[in-house]
């Protein structure tokens, strides 16, 4: 009797990495029959999907590999692979420091994992592939599998902006968009499996320019409308965006596409024009605020979250106060803030890191305190309002209750029926807590007027097909 082969994946970093890890698991199950396990000690393959955004990312990788080396010492047949952005950045240097590693692959070569594994098994020699083969990886991945009512779908890879603090262009390459029909096909497959909410992923999604079947180009604004037209997809999110490409055509989608949530994450990083110039962000604080004004005109109830880097080289107290003023002017909702630390290989790493750690921590505390106050104010303002939530499952705190999320990402716990899971309900917010809300159901999905346009099956049927020699046909 054959034993089940097991795969363990440890993932650090962004939602793109989470998406990539899920695709690795699906791919290796389809090609080799590997089943995911949560226990590293029982796995036949260990994969580490790394992130290079945080401080000391490389050292974190080697500490983890040191722990895994002990497992390989007791099981020489164990295969260890390192992927993600640190792998892309460091390449064979990882092997030099951690000879227990068999496979090193980048974000753009994860689709080649089956061949890499076969090569290691056959020759026991290590494999390194951190190339950037355009968008090839999406052509080689298995069909998507829904895991709950929400799903992430990658629409593009890479970034061309080259902000001075960021490693993404060097680790994930420049911007490459997936063909429009491929994206719609994947989302239609997910919708047919019961997915109700999709989060469109990319390092800079508003730069999306996807080829269509007839040789035209689909913009990001057009893509959102096409996704919204797929029956069952009644909530659309996207992340992440860059202000300089948040164009008026994207803002216009907020006027006519109710499936697009009234919540936007739009990183600004600093409120000081001088620091924004040093960061090579290519916009001013005033230009950022102009985008927000247009958005609020198109969608008055929209909430905005952002990213902030504290203590960038050369940041003075005046620069920081300008950031705090921007936070007050925009009145941001929940946001992410980080103390600056240099990323090797980035232009900012050559700048003198002249803000003391003590000063960075003090500024971070003040900023987070302000953001938390504003976010709590938004939560309190929701008391007594009616919110549409997507029911994700049972509540973490009480299995006799259900839990879901509002458009602005608040967790709402409420009493409901099990058949509500995976559907939308309207609830009245009756209590507000620090990390969640409490609601009372006032309307179920069958009482809603959700738009119906095109069935997932129809989208799947009209997707471009290729014959044995690669000639494409399209069925309108």
Swiss-Prot record:
Binds 2 [4Fe-4S] clusters. One cluster is coordinated with 3 cysteines and an exchangeable S-adenosyl-L-methionine. Residues 145-377 form the Radical SAM core domain. SUPFAM superfamilies: Radical SAM enzymes. Residues 5-122 form the MTTase N-terminal domain. Residues 380-443 form the TRAM domain. [4Fe-4S] cluster 2 binds at residues 159, 163, 166. InterPro entries: Elp3/MiaA/NifB-like_rSAM (IPR006638), Methylthiotransferase (IPR005839), Methylthiotransferase_CS (IPR020612), Methylthiotransferase_N (IPR013848), Methylthiotransferase_N_sf (IPR038135), MiaB_methiolase (IPR006463), rSAM (IPR007197), rSAM_horseshoe (IPR023404). GO terms for molecular function: 4 iron, 4 sulfur cluster binding; metal ion binding; N6-isopentenyladenosine methylthiotransferase activity. Its EC number is 2.8.4.3. It catalyses: N(6)-dimethylallyladenosine(37) in tRNA + (sulfur carrier)-SH + AH2 + 2 S-adenosyl-L-methionine = 2-methylsulfanyl-N(6)-dimethylallyladenosine(37) in tRNA + (sulfur carrier)-H + 5'-deoxyadenosine + L-methionine + A + S-adenosyl-L-homocysteine + 2 H(+). Keywords: 4Fe-4S, Cytoplasm, Iron, Iron-sulfur, Metal-binding, S-adenosyl-L-methionine, Transferase, tRNA processing. One of its GO terms (cellular component) is cytosol. CDD domains: Radical_SAM. Catalyzes the methylthiolation of N6-(dimethylallyl)adenosine (i(6)A), leading to the formation of 2-methylthio-N6-(dimethylallyl)adenosine (ms(2)i(6)A) at position 37 in tRNAs that read codons beginning with uridine. Belongs to the methylthiotransferase family. MiaB subfamily. Monomer. HAMAP family: tRNA_metthiotr_MiaB. This is tRNA-2-methylthio-N(6)-dimethylallyladenosine synthase. It comes from Photorhabdus laumondii subsp. laumondii (strain DSM 15139 / CIP 105565 / TT01) (Photorhabdus luminescens subsp. laumondii). The gene is miaB.
């Amino acid at each position: 009797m054959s034993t089940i082969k097991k795969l363990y994946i440890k993932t650090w970093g962004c939602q793109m990495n989470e998406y990539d890890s899920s695709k690795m698991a699906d791919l290796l199950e389809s090609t080799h029959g590997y089943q995911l396990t949560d226990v590293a000690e029982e796995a036949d393959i260990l994969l580490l999907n790394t992130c290079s955004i945080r401080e000391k990312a490389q050292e974190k990788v080697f500490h983890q590999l040191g722990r895994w080396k002990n497992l390989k010492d007791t099981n020489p047949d164990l295969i260890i692979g390192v992927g993600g952005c640190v792998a892309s950045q460091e390449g064979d240097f990882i092997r030099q420091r951690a000879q227990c590693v068999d496979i090193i692959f980048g974000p753009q070569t994860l689709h080649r994992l089956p061949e890499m594994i076969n090569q290691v098994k056959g020759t026991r020699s290590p494999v390194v592939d951190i190339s950037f083969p355009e968008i090839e990886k999406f052509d080689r991945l298995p069909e998507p599998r829904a895991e709950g009512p929400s799903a992430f779908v990658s629409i593009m890879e890479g970034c061309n902006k080259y902000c001075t603090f960021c490693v993404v262009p060097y680790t994930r390459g420049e911007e490459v968009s997936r063909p429009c029909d491929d994206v719609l096909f994947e989302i239609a497959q997910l919708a047919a499996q019961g997915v109700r909410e999709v989060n469109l992923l990319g390092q800079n999604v508003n730069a999306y320019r996807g080829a269509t079947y007839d040789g035209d180009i689909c913009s990001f604004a057009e893509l959102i409308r096409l996704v919204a037209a797929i029956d069952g997809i009644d909530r659309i999110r996207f992340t992440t965006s860059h202000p300089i490409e948040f164009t008026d055509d994207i803002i216009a989608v907020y006027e006519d596409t109710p499936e697009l949530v009234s919540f936007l994450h739009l990183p600004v990083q600093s409120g000081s024009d001088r620091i924004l110039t040093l960061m090579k962000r290519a916009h001013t604080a005033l230009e950022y605020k102009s985008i927000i004004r247009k958005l609020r005109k198109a969608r008055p109830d929209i909430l905005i979250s952002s990213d902030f880097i504290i203590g960038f080289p050369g940041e003075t107290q005046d620069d920081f106060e300008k950031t705090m003023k921007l936070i007050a002017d925009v009145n941001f909702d929940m946001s992410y803030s980080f103390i600056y630390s240099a990323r090797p290989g980035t232009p900012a790493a050559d700048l003198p890191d002249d803000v003391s750690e003590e000063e960075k921590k003090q500024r971070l505390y003040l900023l987070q305190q302000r953001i938390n106050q504003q976010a709590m104010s938004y939560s309190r303002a929701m008391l007594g309002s009616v919110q549409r939530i997507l029911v994700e499952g049972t509540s973490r705190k009480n299995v006799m209750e259900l839990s879901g999320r509002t458009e602005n990402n608040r967790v709402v716990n409420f009493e409901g029926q099990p058949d509500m899971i995976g559907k939308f309900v309207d609830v009245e917010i009756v209590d507000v807590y620090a990390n969640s809300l409490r609601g009372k159901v006032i309307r179920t999905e069958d009482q809603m007027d959700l738009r119906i346009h095109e069935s997932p099956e129809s989208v799947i049927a009209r997707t471009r097909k290729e014959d044995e020699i690669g000639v494409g046909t399209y069925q309108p």
